[in-house]
Amino acid sequence: MNTPAARPDRYQSFAHIPCDAMALKLLTHLEQLLQAEDTLEPFWQLFLQKAAIAKQPQPGQADALKLICSNSYYIFDLFAAQQDQAGEAMMDELEYQCC
């Protein structure tokens, strides 16, 4: 019987997982998706403002990973509404490995 390969326990170590790079890649994808919209809900307008800061945060400000992980529900909802399978896959991997 074939058993699926076990996924490593993400809580053992975050070493060698490029969480910051994955978050920046997803953030860029989100920005492109949102900027293509004719009108944006106030939530996404504020999100884009925070995203600009999150790319180069100062001490005490949220970085890209924190911004994405703290808004994962809304991001998944956006990708589902847009039928963006690539975005959903990136978000799923980031959430599983890093959030």
Swiss-Prot record:
InterPro entries: CowN. Keywords: Nitrogen fixation. It comes from the Bacteria. The keyword Electron transport does not apply. The keyword Phosphoprotein does not apply. GO terms for biological process: nitrogen fixation. Coiled coil: none annotated. Is required to sustain N(2)-dependent growth in the presence of low levels of carbon monoxide (CO). Probably acts by protecting the N(2) fixation ability of the nitrogenase complex, which is inactivated in the presence of CO. Belongs to the CowN family. This is N(2)-fixation sustaining protein CowN. It comes from Magnetococcus marinus (strain ATCC BAA-1437 / JCM 17883 / MC-1). The gene is cowN.
